[in-house]
Amino acid sequence: MRIGKVKESILKRSVLRQLHNHSEEGSPASGEDAGVLFMPEFSEDAGVALSVNPIEGWTFAAKRAVYGAVNSMLAAGAKIRAISLSLLMPQDTEEKQLKFLMKEIDALCTQEDILVISGHTAVSPFVSTLILSVTAMGIQKKKEEARAEYTDLDLVIAGTIGREGAAMIATEHANRLEERYAPSYIETAKHLFDDGSMSAVSDILQEREVISIHDVREGGIFAALWEMAAAKNVGLSVDLKNIPIRQHTIEVCEYFNLNPYMLRSGGTLLLACANGARLVEQFQKAGIESAVIGQTTSGNDRLIHYDEEARFLEPPKMDEYYKV
């Protein structure tokens, strides 16, 4: 199988179809950022939201872990309360690396008001780099009945695409970028992911106009668009030029011949909403770059427009980060 997320067809055929114990309390699904377990014996109007985010490698591991947990809960309409960590490290790991990682995680959890309530820490001969699995837990208020139709909604991006991957590449391959760019420019690129949490705009995400939210991560915005369309059974019409992206991300991608629209984009949310222009205005007032990039449509056509040309969006492929 290819590197990265398994194909949607494999996920449905070999994972979801093998899980038969479903109930009204909770069921697995593809294209969702978290699962929700409702327990009427404890609460009639709220459930426990759970998400799992795997982190590979040491680069920005703490930020990717905590920000990923926060944003996946926000996308699920939940308030994050705690995380659980599972760390597998290679045999050449030094204790100071582990201590530094946990100090970073603790500082970010304090910033986001999150508890670390359980975990597992081990050295394994079966891994060659850090594997950090983060289980996020939050409270989701019971929603109104799901909409029957998700067509004719505005598609909005909050945050810029590709900055997680660009920051990681700039950090890991700074010496190669120095062949073309000034050290100060590369240093700025390394910090593209510093503001990766969307918790500051959680109130905006609760607006009634917001119908669906998806956390843009592995596979980039193209993968997120496909996953949202597949989950809601809609088509898409997207204007590529409207997708917000920082110049540093473009430069990093051009140097390594990468497609920024298929590059991991932690710290960015994709929203389907009834009034995109109003939502964009609110995000921009909060200091978040945002834009209406298209609409959901009836049927299954998922179209990407650039100037006068249009092409079909393809199913998610391997994240561009792995090509470097």
Predicted regions and their residues:
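Helix-biased detector of long, well-ordered alpha-helical tracts
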Residues: 1-324
